[in-house]
Amino acid sequence: MTAAAPPDGAGPVRDEDAFDIERVAGWLRENATDATGLAGIPTVGQFGGGASNLTYLLRYAASPTFPSGRDLVLRRPPVGTKAKGAHDMRREHDLQAALAPAFPLVPRMVAYCQDEAILGSDFYVMERVEGLILRRDIPPELGLSADATRRLCVTAIDTLADLHAVDVDAAGLSALGRGPGYVARQVAGWSERYRRARTPDVPDAETVMAWLAGHQPPDRGTALIHNDFRFDNLVLDPAEPTRIVGVLDWELATVGDPLMDLGSALAYWVQADDDPVMRRLRRQPTHAPGMLTRAEVVEHYADRAGLEVSTEQWRFYEVFGLFRLAVIAQQIHFRFFHGQTTNPAFAEFGAAVAYLDHRSRSVLGLPEPGEDPERTLNVG
């Protein structure tokens, strides 16, 4: 049972993702760390972003303590998920709860439920972080100048560096790490994922995988890394949009090499002078006047983090980021190719995989096999 009118910022709940909100609301009143303002049944909406865990907005009516009402966010695995290791709600909840004292930009946790009888799976609930989230373009009504956009960009990079500076031992998060060898594990793991998910219509990527395997640097440090650090996971202050008030989506966070995190983040970083295919793949406003280029991001991050990273050294992290993104896209394309999803948004993911392999080869100066990806991906 769900509400007919969804809360602001969320759409209607899809039928296959619906749940008994009265049962969840009752459980929350009994188990929330702070149950103030949780009387009654909230209206419910579903956020449409992301391709993994499901995210809902619960909006409670106004009360004396919360005159504007109270908004909570509920996170759960996809319906029907059996492999809990891939959608570990307990891990995601506990990581943010432990991190909050050292990195206050994480949302405040409200409750974790492991009783699958309540909703059909385990889930957790957190306070909603109020603010703006940038998508493909900066809304013109924000009136951000190039100078203001640059300040926002620098603040985002500094936020990532601040996260990497958290003392994981003091925060009680060291158990997330598996010790030295993070780079090697990532190269081997993502290569295996690509081979398992490959379909006949995409490159074999063996040349890029072989290069990564043969040019692995030693770990450059051990830090808490986000692993999905993008503008659409950052919440901005509406009154001061150059200020970040929240960092969302900690599903992939772990302890590992901070430069691998930066490389993964910059795979999504499309700048104004990129080729037409790369510009078509853009999902965040990193092309806007004032945004730093990828090279400037690396330079600023290295200065902030106290690291020395040469252009040649950075090449490994750049190619790894592009390859990792290709694997993520291919895992989705695999489902589309085999008819497991008919979402039209996934129709060009195979061409995107081919392009990312092409771009990786270009960075490495390797010969290009087969057809030019720009001919297979619509750039109009």
Language-model segments: residues:
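ATP-binding pocket architecture of kinase catalytic cores
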Residues: 41-207, 211-224, 239-242
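Hydrophobic residue at the +6 position relative to the catalytic HRD Asp in the kinase catalytic loop
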Residues: 234-236
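Helical subdomain adjoining the active site within ATP-dependent kinase catalytic cores
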Residues: 307-311, 325-380
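Activation of the activation-loop gatekeeper triad in protein kinase-fold domains
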Residues: 248-253
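Active-site activation/catalytic loop segments of kinase-like enzymes and analogous catalytic loops
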Residues: 260-306, 320-338
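Juxta-kinase regulatory segment immediately upstream of eukaryotic protein kinase catalytic domains
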Residues: 2-37
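All-alpha amphipathic helical-bundle segments outside canonical DNA-binding/catalytic cores
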Residues: 177-178, 309-320
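Catalytic-loop of the protein kinase fold
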Residues: 224-226, 231
